[in-house]
């Protein structure tokens, strides 16, 4: 990934008038690109792997909706730039998507610190997530957040193995109340390989 695709600045973004005109097309392109950057885990959670383009789309959309000007732009860049992979990591938004509020509260209350027990397994080696340190995602009562921002920091040999399409790559958690594993498809792997350079 070229260095210019590791950090977004104002010159990467469309002005609101242009974005408004092109929004429908841009959103279709983003949906298509995200298709192979998504992995479901168990009955309630999904990983959405981020990159320069997903974060750029998120910032554009937030600016379009909230119209907060330069101050908002600074805040959005500060919030989303750290979620762009740096070339030796994968970055994911890990979401628990539970519609029923009672079920959601019950599940999240049983999953304290799940963010610290989440991993990608490459060639038998677990790479545990490093949560984004913006705020604690598990509160004092042990209830976790429904949204986590996770960095999976790879060593060179992990990247090499990940790029081998014959190598099985899994994602999962070691949490006692959510011991699920998913195998990444070759389509997902092919999309995520582009995050390494």
Which residue stretches match the model-derived regions?
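Long, contiguous binding/interaction regions
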Residues: 2-89, 97-197
């Amino acid at each position: 990934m070229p260095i210019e695709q590791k950090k977004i600045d104002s010159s990467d973004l469309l002005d609101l008038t242009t974005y408004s005109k092109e929004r429908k097309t841009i959103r279709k392109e983003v949906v298509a690109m995200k298709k192979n950057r998504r992995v479901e885990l168990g009955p309630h959670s999904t990983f959405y792997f981020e990159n320069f383009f997903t974060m750029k789309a998120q910032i554009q959309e937030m600016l379009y909706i909230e119209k907060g000007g330069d101050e908002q732009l600074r805040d959005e860049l500060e919030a989303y730039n750290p979620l762009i992979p740096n070339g030796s990591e994968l970055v994911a938004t890990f979401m628990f998507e539970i519609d029923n509020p009672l079920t959601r509260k019950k599940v999240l209350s049983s999953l304290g610190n799940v963010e610290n027990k989440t991993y990608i397994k490459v060639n038998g080696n677990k790479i545990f997530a490093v949560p984004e340190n913006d705020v604690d995602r598990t509160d004092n009562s042990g209830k976790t957040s429904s949204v986590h921002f996770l960095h999976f920091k790879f060593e060179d040999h992990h990247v090499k193995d990940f790029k081998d399409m014959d190598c099985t790559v899994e994602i999962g958690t070691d949490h006692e109340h959510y011991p699920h594993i998913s195998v990444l498809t070759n389509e997902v792997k092919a999309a995520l390989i582009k995050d390494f350079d």
